[in-house]
């Protein structure tokens, strides 16, 4: 009788991937990255262990929003003070803080618990083409071949 393989935290090797977000649809990029952050692309996936790899996203300012999402999709947050509801459109985020737009999209696809927050720390987003992780020798992923 075979037993199910359960990975232990000490046995996991984390890789580094780099993804160019230029002209890639936001939702398709987010689903692939969330899957890699969770470790679901590995045959040894264990749901209760942080198995995911590190993902570097460059050119976040040039991500594509389809339809009228740039003007109609609204992100809300509250300051916990009376009248403190703030709203920003996706186009506004893409213009002024493109890293935050990708982080909001990807973090929304991760589990809402301590493990999901830990997996979210493996995401590194940069608006331009430069990043500070050259020492990790990231492997380039072509997102169009994965979707």
UniProtKB/Swiss-Prot annotation:
Pfam families: Ribosomal_L13. GO terms for biological process: negative regulation of translation; translation. Gene3D superfamilies: Ribosomal protein L13. GO terms for cellular component: cytosolic large ribosomal subunit. SUPFAM superfamilies: Ribosomal protein L13. It comes from the Bacteria. InterPro entries: Ribosomal_uL13, Ribosomal_uL13_bac-type, Ribosomal_uL13_sf. Keywords: Ribonucleoprotein, Ribosomal protein. One of its GO terms (molecular function) is structural constituent of ribosome. Belongs to the universal ribosomal protein uL13 family. Part of the 50S ribosomal subunit. This protein is one of the early assembly proteins of the 50S ribosomal subunit, although it is not seen to bind rRNA by itself. It is important during the early stages of 50S assembly. This is Large ribosomal subunit protein uL13. It comes from Leuconostoc citreum (strain KM20). The gene is rplM.
């Amino acid at each position: 009788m075979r037993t199910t393989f359960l990975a232990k935290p000490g046995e996991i090797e984390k890789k580094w991937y780099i993804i160019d977000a230029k002209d890639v649809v936001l939702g398709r990029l987010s689903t692939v990255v969330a899957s890699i952050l969770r470790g679901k692309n590995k045959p040894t996936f264990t749901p209760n262990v942080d198995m995911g790899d590190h993902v570097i996203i460059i050119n976040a300012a040039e991500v594509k929003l389809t339809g009228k999402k740039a003007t109609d999709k609204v992100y809300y947050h509250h300051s916990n003070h009376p009248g403190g509801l703030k709203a920003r459109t996706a186009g506004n985020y893409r213009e002024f803080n493109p890293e935050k737009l990708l982080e909001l999209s990807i973090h929304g696809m991760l589990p809402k618990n301590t493990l999901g927050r830990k997996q979210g720390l493996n995401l590194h987003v940069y608006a331009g083409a430069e990043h500070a992780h050259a020492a990790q020798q990231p492997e380039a992923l072509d997102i169009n071949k994965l979707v």
